[in-house]
Amino acid sequence: MNFDMDLFNQVAKSALEYYGWQDKDEAKLIVLSENATYMVKNKETGNNDGVLRIGRPGYHTLSELNSEMKWLKQINEYTPLIVANPMKGLNGEYIQNVKGPDGEVYNCVITEFLKGSSPDENDEEQMVKQFKYLGETTAYLHRQTEIWNGTSKIDRFEWSFDNVIGKTPKWGDWRSFPDMTPEAQTFLEDVVQIIEKRLKRYGKTGNNFGLIHADLRLANLLIEGEQIKVIDFDDCGFGWHLQDLASALSFIESKPIVPKLVNAWLSGYKKILPFTDTDFEEIDTFIMMRRLQLTAWLGSHQQSGPVAELSVGWMEGTMDLAERFKRLFG
């Protein structure tokens, strides 16, 4: 996946005009992933006025983006959670269609800036405490989508097995990871088959499947005191609830602290929603599936800032997880 940074910087500058901010603000790139994300800073005060997200053409339809905005509004109005509110442009719309210098139309949205910092994965005591709040936060999201009559009208992608690590993977093919060996691929193919069989047996019900955030990793959480704020709903879609637990463990799945984090997450989740023995039995399935999904993401996002650092030792950690998974369920 290639990003033309000069092009995206020009689109970001143009996007500010749609909000009437071109004179007082400037956009500075902070993250490259599925989208380009910019901090919108006031030129005089240096304050953060918002966060601009520029989508790659074709990644989301306008209908999908409007559905995301609808869900954010529901979360803010009907749950105790804090999420970043989208801001309307001069035309009264949340989504701005900005024409780039290449002639393509880029969907842009600015959300409010939320204070806070991402969890520090090196502070284990705090991590365990925060995962308890994260479990509770996740359960509020799941409960809201279960009772919201508008959920069925939401137009969002489905994070099915095929769309995650199967025949039509949205983030790319895990087999294309640069350090993948023929031996590792053969072993992981067996693991993928086990995952598919277990998911078919687990099934999709109103209690285990629905509208989810789908990318509740540490980078998309902000901590301020004991309050967890959730950002970046760009990948929200329909999936298994356990995918939100697995995504919270993104890039740290092989660390020794994971069992403590899972237990903390469960203790928070169960305060709001029930969690069955059947759900518990599939936690490892979803963690393994997420790990393979991230393997695909790392392979297909070589331009993203943190990829080089994250890729160090990735295959070793992945194979350790896979071998354990196969011992348990193979």
Language-model regions, residue ranges each:
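A conserved alpha-helical element in kinase catalytic cores
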Residues: I54-G103, N122, Q126-K132
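Juxta-kinase regulatory segment immediately upstream of eukaryotic protein kinase catalytic domains
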Residues: M1-E26
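ATP/Mg2+ or Mg2+-diphosphate-binding catalytic cores
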Residues: L294-G330
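Active-site activation/catalytic loop segments of kinase-like enzymes and analogous catalytic loops
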Residues: H241-P274, R290-P306
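Conserved short submotifs of the Hanks-type protein kinase catalytic core
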Residues: D102-S117
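A cross-family kinase active-site recognition segment
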Residues: L90, E121-E183, F209
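Active-site acidic catalytic loop and adjacent metal/ATP-binding pocket
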Residues: S33-V51, P86, E196-L242
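ATP-binding glycine-rich phosphate-binding loop
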Residues: Y19-K41
